[in-house]
């Protein structure tokens, strides 16, 4: 009788371990999101994997100034003059090299490119032959609108 109990206990312990193993295997991969932060007199909208150092892009402003710095964390991106597009809007802007291997440019929040980015969630920065695309999926476009409102001075 003891061998049967031992086998039953081993089987039950094995069954209890299986859901944890399945759960560990079915965890979603790191997911890119947009997060809005306000601290120290600035507003930052970051395209990131939460709780990591992984960034694709950030927008940063001082509330009410009507300008934002767009930083791109694309190792292929280069400094120089860029064509920035969103929807049917386009503009030429200077892209500067910045610390940490990123590049950045300044966007006017009343420019048609920013308005089209807020409306459609897609923006492209093309420097020479290289293109960096910034996307805010529909679930994050509310944060993009909120960023624009805070930075333009609307409350």
What do these predicted ranges mean?
Residues 1-8, 17-18:
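Bacterial N-terminal signal peptides that target proteins for export
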